């Protein structure tokens, strides 16, 4: 009989899920997208980039050009603000208005996970695992716009 190696990590139970992703606002939406085989990526809109895309996009695919990119295609979360209910959080409205959308998405996903877990009263043993690629947030992009785009 093999000896079970002791782990220094405590066991984890995933008891709730939540997500905000391109094209979906809930885990059920995500499963529907998967079941239908849909792809929810799209081209950037003016609201996504706040800059004339023609200045940045190259029509020479695969050829490196300084300050140019080959695609504006990506996974953009759209319409979230139309459905976000700030009153469900015990935070000051002014603070919520100042937060970058990536933080609001995280708050909403955590709210969904807690609701699904049905253990909202047992928070002392509750943790959150967040995933986010290291792309700039909208707030970071606005900061860059205020400084760099004025120089262009």
Residues of each region from the PLM?
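Cys-dependent condensing catalytic cores that perform Claisen condensation/acyl-transfer
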Residues: 2-152
């Amino acid at each position: 009989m093999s000896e079970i190696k002791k782990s220094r990590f405590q066991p984890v139970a995933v008891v709730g899920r939540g997500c905000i992703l391109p094209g979906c606002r809930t885990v059920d939406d995500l499963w529907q997208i998967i079941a239908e085989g849909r792809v929810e990526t799209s081209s950037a809109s003016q609201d996504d980039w706040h800059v004339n895309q023609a200045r940045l996009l190259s029509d020479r695919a695969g050829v490196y050009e300084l300050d140019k990119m080959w695609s504006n295609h990506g996974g953009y979360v759209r319409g979230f603000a139309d459905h976000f209910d700030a009153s469900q959080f015990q935070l000051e409205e002014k603070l919520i208005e100042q937060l970058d959308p990536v933080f609001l998405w995280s708050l909403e996903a955590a709210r969904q996970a807690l609701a699904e877990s049905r253990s909202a009263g047992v928070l002392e043993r509750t943790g959150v695992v967040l995933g986010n690629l290291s792309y700039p947030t909208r707030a970071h992009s606005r900061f860059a716009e205020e400084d760099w785009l004025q120089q262009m």
